[in-house]
Structure formats: structure tokens, C-alpha cells
Amino acid sequence: MGFNEFIGKLFGNKATRDMKEIKPWVDKIKAVYPEIAKLSNDELRAKTVELKKYISDSAAEEQKKIEELKGTIETTELEDREGIFAQIDKLEKEVLEKYEKALDDVLPQAFAIVKDTARRFSENPELVVTATDFDRELAAQGKDFVRIEDDKAIWQNHWIAGGNDMVWSMVHYDVQLFGGVVLHKGKIAEMATGEGKTLVATLPVFLNALTGNGVHVVTVNDYLSKRDSEWMGPLYQFHGLSVDCIDKHQPNSDARRRAYMADITFGTNNEFGFDYLRDNMAVSPKDLVQRKHNYAIVDEVDSVLIDDARTPLIISGPVPKGEDQLFEQLRPLVERLFEAQKKLATQYLADAKRLIASDDKKDQEEGFLALFRSHKALPKNKPLIKFLSEQGIKAGMLKTEEIYMEQNNKRMPEATDPLYFVIDEKQNSVDLTDKGIDLITGNAADPTLFVLPDITSQLSALENETDLTEEEKLAKKDELMTNYAIKSERVHTINQLLKAYAMFEKDDEYVVIDGQVKIVDEQTGRIMEGRRYSDGLHQAIEAKEGVKVEAATQTFATITLQNYFRMYHKLSGMTGTAETEAGELWDIYKLDVVVIPTNRPIARKDMNDRVYKTKREKYKAVIEEIEEMVKEGRPVLVGTTSVEISEMLSKMLAMRKIEHNVLNAKLHQREADIVAQAGQKSIVTIATNMAGRGTDIKLSPEVKAAGGLAIIGTERHESRRVDRQLRGRAGRQGDPGSSVFFVSLEDDLMRLFSSDRIASVMDKLGFKEGEMIEHKMISNSIERAQKKVEENNFGIRKRLLEYDDVMNKQRVAVYTKRRHALMGERIGMDIVNMIWDRCAYAVELGDFDNVKMEILQTLAMEVPFTEEEYNKMRKEDLAEKTFEAAMNNFKRKTDRMAQIANPVIKQVYEMQGHMYENIMIPITDGKRLYNISVNLKAAYETEGKEIVKSFEKAILLHTIDDAWKENLRELDELKHSVQNASYEQKDPLLIFKLESVNLFDNMVNKINNNTISVLMRGQIPVQEPEQVREAAPEPQAPRQQYREEKQDLSDPHQQAAAEHDTREVKREPVRAEKTVGRNDPCPCGSGKKYKNCHGQNA
């Protein structure tokens, strides 16, 4: 007995322990279920109202205290408000804790209600209940599943979802109740494909929606979010819970705001994230769409939290400098360089073949060196890959590589200097050699055009020059830094263009559609709309392909999906495959993965991998296997890793006259139709990775008899998870099926990470071309290679998250302060803190004249102490004295502002109040005039104090936005510059953390300084009532100036999962929408005409 088995026997494995913990909950649900099943339809709905009340009452006391405290804010002195807000925050936390406890109390009843509602819909074509206002509202909106007859609402059991007429036929199994408990507890439920994850989510969604705080159901693409909101919606709406989907409405619209106010909101991960960013660019509270982040269930959670983890959401705008033409200018040089390297690599390969075939040992050594050079020149060269698969060749080349790698790569330049540039596939890097630099510099006047100067030694040499004045030194320094920045940009552009030519292949990593370069998601084969490679790489590919190079942009707001989802009070997720990444999900998100057993045992047969020497043999074997399956009458799903391979297999099948469908990034519009047919007899479907497709393949009875769906993988993926997802397409709900992967030593995974050992095994066993090896040892070896890649990818993601965590702390602080300013409730408290900060800063300046100047410039007042007092008193006391004087000065000025404005406001309101909602009030700080928009009614009711609040808000928002935008740019530049620290044996992350603190402090000082200096000087020029004019609407920045994108910061060969599905939805049947004539009876059942009832606003 092994150690792990012994420990397992002693303590039980994790799956057993998880089930043991959840089973009592499921037993409770099953115990209350008979009682719930006995209730009439009306009683069942009344039960939901009862549970809502129970939850609401559990924290009623705390809610009452919060309202009381909020009522005291306006009458409390500014300095003392902080204590009230701290109490409110503490009480709000207590409310959430009370709600969680109450939810646990009612869980068995709530889950039983959902299960029995599902049963009633599946067993009855119609459910008749007493009509409520909510039922009438739904009927008036034209929902096809409910109609009103007198005082009754008739709910049907079929409705339109995703363009299809769905008849409800599902009831929750016990394993789905297990899954529901796991999700409610804030964990990840791993459930096999076909186990009904969508139905499982109805349980915790219903339960948590009872609080009224909102539940977000997050999907990976807009087709699924719309379909699921329509499919599951009536189950919730039957119980009076509102349901909406943000993807059905335009950003920043009232409809989207209403969608967030619904009890249950569906949407894609991107749109939730972008709405958060847009909210933090809003200039008025009425522009906000989201409310507090309460509870989210993420579908395909591994795809969102792991694959998308290196992909920040970014809202950017145009940069003031003109369009950058550098990529266009340098493209011909790089093209020449690439062609020269291609010739060189071909020559080295020809020399290698000739020399290795010789009997002379010296010739053979020379031959393997030439082969190694050809490999370093262009590792993806197809003739090279084919030659490396021959017996003993790869082993010989690896031996040569070891010789040159000895003593920390000491001899490597001997091998690589004859090349123009060197490619390292594993590191995803391209480095120019001196020979390459000479070629692109050519006849240029400056031979150092593409060589970065040693800026450190140049600067220290400048410091030591004695014959220059300080001013001349500064001018020279500026010149050096400018020259360095220009050259750095030029070298960076060359490097990115080289990557575009040498490491990115069209129709593999990207496609060109309608004159645009679009990234293909390597996990799912979908086009990733709106996503661009970062760091100039996308522009480089655009230049290579001869399409329009997009202009450079500047970031206005950004967040990674991980940091967005960490804001939720409670987070859970569902997926078919998370166990392999359980460590990462726990490490980063503290999310526990619980594997839910299948409802029926899996009958799928998973076979060992079949390994061939070359891709040609592998594809030949794949076609023969497909042919065999078609003869047996089994449907076949062929999983490929790129568009190119799917098209090549399609041509091979067409030559054999085998009918088939292709599903890839170029043909995704037909996806739903193709998947619907994929389970029919002898149907062959070729699909680029099926991860996250969200549609089950259903089998006909004759197919089940023939052996079920056959899955054929044409290549092992870097991630075991994607392979498991492909396998999981077969064998749903106990159906028969099989899966097998065909692998060749030329595949990327094998070439980069695993094939040395397998190649030597095949050589020893004397395998000839065309022969195949199938052994558990080989499959294990491939899995080890995948683990190696996964660990490497985890390291990259963790590192990126550590960088983003630094930015996230700053983002939270800035956005909190911005929200205070926007809502106006806590703005006074923030301004008091800013004034204190400026006072404390001023008294620390050391020299009395400097202190005097600082107080005069920032606080717009005389220094409140003498020079003698300054030298004698403690700094804390001086700060306190200055603060007291500053606050008195500030109150006097704001009171004066309100007094001057009030007579004018009073007159305008009383005489023209019906004409204006908002008016413009001009305020000046002596340098510039600010036109402040103020609500006329609020200004009248507060005797002018609202003007002060609006002035404070406008100045603070403007200052924060400018400073944050600048800070983001500086953080971006810092992130690039700290990477050089690794050459000095320093940790770039540590340097980044230290430097970013300085940047943040500078930004906070800038915000405080600029805000206070304007507020302290603000005054209203005396104005006559007839000069008052109506305020224009708040200036929301024009949307066309902004670009919303997901930038991919990752290695292109480890792309993240798709999030935008633009498939064509089938035409809806005519009966989907009920049109009501203006004079027809209103569908709500009120008896009034439609035009006089719900049709008034239509």
C-alpha cells in the first residue's frame, strides 16, 4: 500500500469528505420536499414571500440603525462625520452576515420550492395562479409564457429561449442538489458535461436573490447569457423575482441600469467588468448602472478565472501625439531581415543533412551544429521539423545544444553569431545579433541606429565633466534621455515586427477578416472580438499583413477579471474541468473545488494516446479512424487546435468523399445548427477546440446502439483541462462513447517539452515510419509534459496578478474617493482630510519662508503663527493650529458663497422654477472660470449650500480623473522599465512595488494640492437673476472616442478563452412576441384599454 493510499484510508479522500459535509443539507431538502409538494400553486408562491420576509427581518434592527445614522449626517460637523461613516460601514457588514445566516436557515425550503416548481412545469402544460401586479406587468411586456384571464394568471410550460421554442422538461436530481449547496457555500462545483450545470445554478440563484441585493450569473459569451436568462427566467419570475440580461441593452442606458436593479442579472464577464470601469468614469450619479457587488456565479469558471487571468479589460482613448508610423517605416527592413534568415536556415538545413549522412565523425559534428543553427534560426520551419523526427536526429541536436549551453551559455554566441536573429520558442523571445543589426542598419549615417546606448555610464560620465555648468549638464541629460527614449522605441518596434514575422502564423494564431487582424482563441478556436495583443505586437502584425495600423491609445481605466470578481461579497463557479487547476483557484481566489459525482456512471471508453513519428502519418491515421467509425454508423467529433488543421482535415475528408461539417473561428455563425446535428448517425464534425461551447450533443437511439459518439483529438493541448473538456463531450448522462488522441513527435507540445524521452524509446524499439506506439507509459509522459506547461503558465499568471495587485490597491483607493465625490455623501469628510494633509505637509517644510509660501499658495491664507512660534512649537501642534485656521477660513468662504448666491437662486426658483431643472453657476479661483451645474430645487431648499457641494464635487472629480489617468501611464512605463532590474540580480517586482508607492504618494499629493488650492480660492462673481442660464446635460465623454478592449498580455500560444459569441440566432417563431393594438384590452387583465393602461408609456 502506497503512502497516499494509506493516508486516504486513514482520513478519507477530499471527494468523500466533501460529500460527507454536504449530505446533511441534501437530507434536509429531501425531508421538507413532501410538505412543499403538497402546497397549491398559490401557497407555493406565498411560501417564497414568507422566506423573503424572514430574511429581511433577520437584519431589520441593523437596517433601522443605518437609516437613523444617515439621518444625522447633515447636522454633524464635517470633522466628526468620519465616526458616523465608520459605524455605518460596520453595520452594513453585520447585515450581510445576518443575511448569510438567514439564507442557511431557509436553504432546505428554498431549494425544495425550486425543485417542485420545476416538477410542476414539467408535468403540467399550464399552471393557474391568482394574478399579482408582477404577473400583470410581465403579461403587459408581451412575455409569451404568461397571460391574464380575469383575476388569474396562466403560466405556460414552454417559451422562447435563444431563438428556439423550449418545452420545460427538467427536474433536479439529487446530485444537482449537491451542486446547488456547493455553489451557495461560495465554492466551485465541478460537474461533468451533460449533468445540467445550468439547472443547478437555479437553486443558489433563487435562494440568494431572496435578499433583494442582486445575484449576477456570469457566462463566457453573449449567446449563452441571453439564452440562459430566457430559458431559466420563468422559473424565477413565477415567484415574483425579476430577471434581466445586461447584454440585451446598450451600455450606459436606462435599460441596462434597470437590468442591474433586477433580482437576478445575467451577463458576460467582460460586460460586468466594463460596466464597473464605465461607472468609475461617470460624471453624475444618474450615469451609474451597477449596485454593490453581492453574489456572483461564474459559469465555465476555469475559463474566466484562469484562461482570462492574463487579460485586463481596458478602456482607452486617443493619445494627443499623432498616429505612430514607425511600424510602417520599419516593416521593409524587417521583411528583408526575415527573408535573409529564411535563406540562411534553409542552407544550414541542407548542409546538416549532407554532413550528418557522412561517415566522418567530424563532419557529423559539423552537421549537428548546422542543424542546431537552423533550429535557432527558424524552429517552426516544416522541413526542419520533419528531419528532426528521423531516428537519432533530435537526440544528436540536443547533445550539440548541451555543449554550447555549458558554463551558463558561455559558448552559445559561437553557435548563434552567424545568424541574423535568434528565436527562443520556450521563452517566446527574438534577439537580434550583430550581423542582423548590420543588415538593417545598412548604409545609414548612424551605425548605432538600432543599438541601445549604456545610459547609466553616459550619465555618470556627464556628472564627472567639470567644465560644464549645472544648467548645461541638465540640458545634456535631457538630450541623452530623449535620444535613449527614441532609440528604445525603435528597438522595441523592430523586436515586435520580428516576432510578428517569425513567431505568428496567419490562420493559426490570428486571422485577417475585413481588413482587420483578429486573434483566434487557442483554447476554443473562436475569434476573440475586441481583443488585441498588447505592447505594440498587434500593430506589428497589422503592418506585416498590410492592413491599417491602428493608432496608439492611452489607458483611462483598467482592471483584470480576477480583481473584478474578488470584489464580490460571495463568489462561486461551475465548470466541467477545474480539478487540475484546484491549487491555483485556492491559492489566488480562496475558492475550493468540489467534484460532484455524475447522476449515472460514465460509460465512455478513454483510450491511450496513439503516437506517430510525423504529422503526415498521424493525419493519415486520423482519416482512417474516421472512415472506420462512419462505417460503424457512429457520429465523430474531431477536435483540432487551429483553423489551419481543421481546413486541411476537411480537404482530406472531401478527397475521400466523406460528408462532414466544419466548425472553426471563420464559420462560427453556423455553430448551433452544426452542434445540433453532431449526434446523428455517421455525421462527422471537425471543430477547433470545443471548450466553453455550452451546447450538449444529444444522441439518437440507433447511435447509442452503435457505440455512441467517438471523440478524436488530433493533438494534445498544453492544458489537460482542454483535453478533458473535449473528452467530456462524449458519454453524457451515462451514454456510451469513446475518446482517443492522436499525437506526433512534430506537435508543438511534444517538440518543446516531451519528445526527447519518447523519441529515444521509439528509436530503441526500432519503430519505422508509419508505425504507431500506444502505451500507458507514453500517455503518462505526455501528461507530465502538460503538467510542466501548466506550472509554467501558473507562474506567469501569479506574477502578473502580483503586479496587478499593486495597481489594484491604488485603484480601490482612488475609486473609493471618486465615488465619495460623485455621490456627495462623504465628500465633506474627504475634503477635511485633504485640508489636514496639506497643513501637515506645510509645517514639515523646515524653512519658515517656505512654510509661509506653501500656506499662502495652497490654503490661500496668512500663516497662523510667528517665526518664533514655528521654531519653538511641536510640529503636531503647528499642524493643528494651521488646520483650525484653514477650516475656519474654508467655512467662512463657503458660507459667503451660499449667501451671495441665495437671493439670486430664490428669485429664479420662485419666478422661473418651472422652466429650469439645473442651472449654471459661474465660480472662479482667480485663474480660471468654472461653470458649475447645480440642481435648482436642491439649491433653493438648502439656501445655496448645494452650490458649494456641486463645486466641491466638480473640482474633485476633474482632479482625480486627470491624476489617475497620468498615474496609469506612469505605472505602465514603470512596469516596462523595472524589467531591466533582473540584469542587476534584483527582483523587478520588488522594485515595482517600491517605486509605485512613490508614484501613488505623488498622485495623492497632486490631487490634494490641486483640489484644495482651487476650493480655498473659489468665489462667485456677483450675478443678476436675468443672467442665469439653464445647465446643459452633464458632459458624458463621447463614446466613439473610447475603445473598450481586452489586451492579451500572455504568450500567444497560451491564449485565454472566448468571451464574445456572435453566432446568428435562429429566426424566432412569429408567436414569440404578442403585439397589442392601442384600443385592445390591456393584457394585464385590468379591463382598461391598452392605451389607457400599460400602453401609456409605450
Curated annotation (Swiss-Prot):
Reactions catalysed according to its record: ATP + H2O + cellular proteinSide 1 = ADP + phosphate + cellular proteinSide 2
GO molecular function: ATP binding; metal ion binding; protein-exporting ATPase activity
CC cofactor: Zn(2+)
Gene that specifies this protein: secA
Record membrane topology: Peripheral membrane protein
Broad class of where this protein is predominantly found: membrane
Biological process terms in GO annotation: intracellular protein transmembrane transport; protein import; protein targeting; protein transport by the Sec complex
Biased composition (Basic and acidic residues): 1041-1051, 1058-1077
Purpose of the protein: Part of the Sec protein translocase complex. Interacts with the SecYEG preprotein conducting channel. Has a central role in coupling the hydrolysis of ATP to the transfer of proteins into and across the cell membrane, serving as an ATP-driven molecular motor driving the stepwise translocation of polypeptide chains across the membrane.
Keywords: ATP-binding, Cell inner membrane, Cell membrane, Cytoplasm, Membrane, Metal-binding, Nucleotide-binding, Protein transport, Translocase, Translocation, Transport, Zinc
Top-level enzyme category: translocase
PANTHER family tied to this protein: CHLOROPLAST PROTEIN-TRANSPORTING ATPASE, SECA INNER MEMBRANE COMPONENT OF SEC PROTEIN SECRETION SYSTEM
Cofactor binding description: May bind 1 zinc ion per subunit.
Catalytic activity, EC: 7.4.2.8
Protein name: Protein translocase subunit SecA
Subunit and partners: Monomer and homodimer. Part of the essential Sec protein translocation apparatus which comprises SecA, SecYEG and auxiliary proteins SecDF. Other proteins may also be involved.
Superkingdom of origin organism: Bacteria
GO cellular component: a single term: plasma membrane
UniProt entry tagged with the keyword Manganese: no
Binding, Zn(2+): C1082, C1084, C1093, H1094
Intrachain S-S bonds: none
